[in-house]
């Protein structure tokens, strides 16, 4: 009853974006309007008073483009993404996705909660990566599934993913929300929330790839990166964290200066 009620709620509160002119990114809304997994997909455009623009699709809760002004005031797209829904639905990628249930790796594809062992997909070197993400034989991982649209305004969209108990091996019926808000100080606020009826694990994130050149054919070797981090978590040959917390000083992971 619980799960049926939340499914109905998600569907009843879903709404369509207001009709707008085509985004300045050059993306075509029609190229994202399709039926996938029995649900409608679309492209939603968020704007602010400064002319900044963010395009989002409800397939995987993905940020498709972020248009920002360069030093000369020219608008440029600074994230990597596809220009149509077909590529997102058929080419494995995490471009701009709202990843779940569990971003990153779970060692050996196994979790234990209250002495109950749950086997998860082992889709990456024997580990469970990004919720077991795959397109075949069936879409798995939230980044490959269609979200419901609960709310959309000029500068905000709320996307809902209803995940049934046992999906990809994870326990608990989960209702997860991803809220993207484009603020007037040119920030993108991302808020994730989730509720469940059983003890489970949740670790959501966004998976944008940035290229600040605006020209996605250019390398990013001219970028400057600063991370206020003194330590990092080393990984083994399968990219699984070892449990060690190591200093960044003297390593290629030092971006503190």
List PLM regions with ranges.
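C-terminal motif of bacterial Sec signal peptides marking the signal peptidase cleavage site
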Residues: 11-14
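Bacterial N-terminal signal peptides that target proteins for export
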Residues: 1-3
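An exposed, glycine/acidic-rich loop-and-rim segment of catalytic or binding clefts
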Residues: 16-52, 58-257
């Amino acid at each position: 009853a619980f799960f049926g009620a939340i499914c109905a709620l998600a569907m009843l509160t879903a709404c369509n974006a207001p009709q707008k002119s085509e985004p300045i990114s050059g993306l075509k809304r029609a190229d994202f309007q399709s039926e996938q997994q029995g649900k409608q997909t679309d492209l939603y455009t968020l704007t602010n008073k400064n002319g900044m623009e963010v395009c989002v699709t409800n397939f995987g809760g993905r940020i498709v483009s972020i248009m920002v002004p360069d030093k000369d005031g020219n608008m440029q797209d600074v994230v990597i993404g596809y220009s149509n829904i077909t590529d997102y639905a058929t080419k494995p990628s995490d471009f701009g996705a709202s990843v779940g249930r569990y971003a990153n790796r779970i060692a050996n594809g196994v979790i234990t909660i209250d002495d109950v062992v749950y086997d998860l997909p082992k889709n990456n070197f024997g580990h469970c990566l990004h919720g077991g993400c795959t397109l075949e034989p069936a879409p798995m991982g939230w980044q490959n599934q269609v979200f419901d649209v609960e709310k959309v305004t000029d500068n905000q969209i709320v996307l809902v993913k209803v995940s049934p108990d046992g999906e990809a091996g994870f326990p608990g019926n989960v209702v997860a929300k991803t809220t993207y808000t484009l603020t007037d100080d040119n920030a993108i606020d991302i808020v994730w929330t989730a509720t469940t009826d059983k003890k489970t694990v949740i670790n959501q994130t966004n998976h944008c790839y940035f290229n600040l050149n605006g020209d996605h054919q250019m390398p990013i070797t001219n970028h400057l990166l600063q991370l206020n981090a003194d330590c990092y978590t080393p990984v083994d040959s399968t990219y699984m964290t070892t449990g060690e917390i190591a200093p960044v000083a003297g390593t290629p992971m030092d971006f503190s200066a």
